[in-house]
């Protein structure tokens, strides 16, 4: 439920929404079932008619998402419906899309969640290292393994067994690394980031 909420809050139009999931192949089928159940629990059998399901910022953005989905490859496990005139994009899960597709190379900014499988944690780390440094890295599982992964993979922020929550604290610095941004803000970090120290 946390992953679905984090991906679909504001229709996925948040900078810290998960862009994709890397899932061990031994638990992928079970996770896909749970993700679909979470969508139904939150918005019913047809989220289009749920009064609290958000919409895309405009029709052009909905059209862009439709284009991303049409060329993604892989298997659409659920969702996939895009209605440009209503700015509606259904909560969508795409299993093992083409890694070279626009869906995997661009920031999605929509309630579309690609799920990629792996056999060894090192494969997941390699996949993360091959991509731009993420603004947020979410790890679900044993915290020790998550810490080892974070030692290998640079990111702006990290959360273990949760999503988006690292941004909610005004005391924790927030920002990216490389392509995901430079500098930190929130609380004391804001003063340091936006101050010009002179000697």
Which residues fall in each region the model found?
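ALDH superfamily catalytic-core signature
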Residues: 1-98, 160
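Conserved C-terminal structural/oligomerization subdomain of aldehyde/semialdehyde dehydrogenase
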Residues: 88-199
């Amino acid at each position: 439920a946390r992953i679905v909420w984090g991906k679909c809050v504001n229709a996925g139009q948040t900078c810290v929404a998960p862009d994709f999931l890397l899932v061990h192949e031994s638990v992928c089928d079970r996770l896909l079932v749970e993700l679909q159940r979470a969508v139904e629990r939150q918005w019913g059998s047809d989220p289009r008619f749920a009064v609290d399901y958000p919409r895309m910022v405009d029709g052009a953005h909905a059209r862009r998402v439709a284009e991303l989905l049409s060329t993604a490859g892989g298997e659409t496990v659920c969702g996939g419906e895009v209605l440009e005139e209503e700015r509606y994009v259904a909560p969508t899960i795409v299993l093992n899309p083409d890694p070279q597709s626009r869906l995997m190379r661009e920031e999605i900014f929509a309630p579309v969640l690609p799920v990629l499988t792996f056999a060894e944690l090192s494969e997941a780390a390699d996949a993360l290292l091959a991509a731009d440094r993420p603004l947020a890295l979410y790890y679900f599982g044993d915290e020790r393994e998550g810490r080892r992964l974070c030692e290998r993979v640079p990111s702006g922020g990290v959360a273990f067994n949760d999503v988006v929550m690292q941004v909610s604290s005004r005391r924790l610095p927030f920002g990216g690394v490389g392509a995901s941004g430079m500098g930190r803000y929130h609380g004391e970090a804001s003063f340091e980031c936006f101050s010009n120290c002179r000697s």
